[in-house]
C-alpha cells in the first residue's frame, strides 16, 4: 500500500489499529486486551479545576514506551476512549486518554455535549491549555518516553488533535478520525505528520471543508495523508454509534 510508505512506524500501527473494520466496541471487548495491561486514574489541577485522565500501560520493560495521547469524542472521557487506551497499551504504548471537561465529566446527549464542546471551538487556545496540562502528567511516569508522543482523536477529539498538530512541533504524529478539519487555527509549523481518516459520507465534513483543509496543509507544506473511506459515515470507528 502506497500510503503506508508515507507514514511513520507509529502512525502505521495506529492506522491498522483504529481504521480497521472492527465490529466489536472496545469497552465490550475486554478479552481482546491482555491481563498485563495496568490502568489508573491520574488527577491534576488546571486553573482551579480538577481533571481525571486515564492511563494504561504494560509494566513489562525497563525501557520507556512511546506515548499515545487519546482525545475523546464530545461525550467526554467515556469507556470507549478508555477502551482505545487499553488497546494501545496492549500494543506496547503508554496511553493517556484525556479528560477534556474536568472532573471526568461525561454526557449522553448532543445538547449537553455541544455545550461542553463549544468553548473549545470558539476559543481554540482553551484546548491547548487542557492538552498541555494532560501532557505534563506524562512526566510522572518513568516508563513513558516524553520525547516520543503521538496524538489521536475521535470526532471532537479529531478536530482537537489537528489543532495540536498545528500548534505543537514536538509531536511524532497526529491521527484524526472523523473529526472536523477547519477549526480556526492556522499551522504554526509543518513538522508534525498528520493522518486523517474521514468517512466519505460524513455529513459533518462537507467537500468544501475537505478542500479548504488540503489547501491549508499544502500551503504550509505539512506532510499529511488524507484517507476518505467510501460508504462510511460519521463516527465510523465506533460500533456503538447510531
Predicted feature locations:
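Serine-hydrolase catalytic machinery in alpha/beta-hydrolase-like enzymes
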Residues: 24-35, 41-141, 238-242
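C-terminal motif of bacterial Sec signal peptides marking the signal peptidase cleavage site
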Residues: 15-18
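Bacterial signal peptide processing site
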Residues: 20-22
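Short beta-strand/loop motif that positions the catalytic acidic residue
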Residues: 196-198
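Primarily recognizes the serine-hydrolase "nucleophile elbow" in alpha/beta-hydrolase
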Residues: 131-191
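Acidic catalytic loop of the alpha/beta-hydrolase fold
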Residues: 201-205, 234
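Short alpha-helix in the alpha/beta-hydrolase fold that links the catalytic acid
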Residues: 84, 206-216, 226-229
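C-terminal catalytic histidine-bearing segment of alpha/beta-hydrolase fold enzymes
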Residues: 220-242
Amino acid at each position: 500500500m502506497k500510503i503506508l510508505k508515507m507514514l511513520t512506524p507509529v502512525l502505521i500501527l495506529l492506522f491498522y489499529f483504529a481504521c480497521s473494520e472492527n465490529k466489536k466496541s472496545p469497552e465490550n471487548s475486554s478479552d481482546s486486551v491482555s491481563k498485563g495491561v495496568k490502568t489508573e486514574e491520574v488527577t491534576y489541577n488546571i486553573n482551579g479545576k480538577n481533571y481525571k485522565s486515564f492511563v494504561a500501560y504494560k509494566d513489562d520493560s525497563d525501557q520507556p514506551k512511546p506515548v499515545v495521547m487519546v482525545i475523546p469524542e464530545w461525550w467526554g472521557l467515556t469507556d470507549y476512549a478508555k477502551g482505545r487506551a487499553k488497546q494501545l497499551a496492549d500494543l506496547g504504548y503508554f496511553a493517556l486518554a484525556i479528560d477534556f471537561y474536568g472532573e471526568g465529566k461525561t454526557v449522553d446527549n448532543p445538547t449537553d455535549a455541544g455545550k461542553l464542546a463549544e468553548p473549545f471551538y470558539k476559543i481554540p487556545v482553551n484546548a491547548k491549555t487542557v492538552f498541555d496540562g494532560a501532557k505534563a502528567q506524562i512526566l510522572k511516569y518513568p516508563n513513558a518516553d516524553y520525547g516520543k508522543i503521538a496524538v489521536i482523536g475521535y470526532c471532537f477529539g479529531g478536530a482537537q488533535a489537528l489543532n495540536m498538530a498545528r500548534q505543537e512541533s514536538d509531536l511524532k504524529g497526529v491521527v484524526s478520525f472523523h473529526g472536523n478539519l477547519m477549526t480556526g487555527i492556522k499551522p504554526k509549523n509543518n513538522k508534525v505528520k498528520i493522518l486523517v481518516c474521514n468517512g466519505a459520507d460524513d455529513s459533518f465534513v462537507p467537500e468544501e471543508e475537505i478542500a479548504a483543509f488540503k489547501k491549508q496543509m499544502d500551503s504550509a507544506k505539512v506532510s499529511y495523508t488524507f484517507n476518505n473511506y467510501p460508504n462510511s459515515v460519521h463516527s465510523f470507528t465506533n460500533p456503538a454509534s447510531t
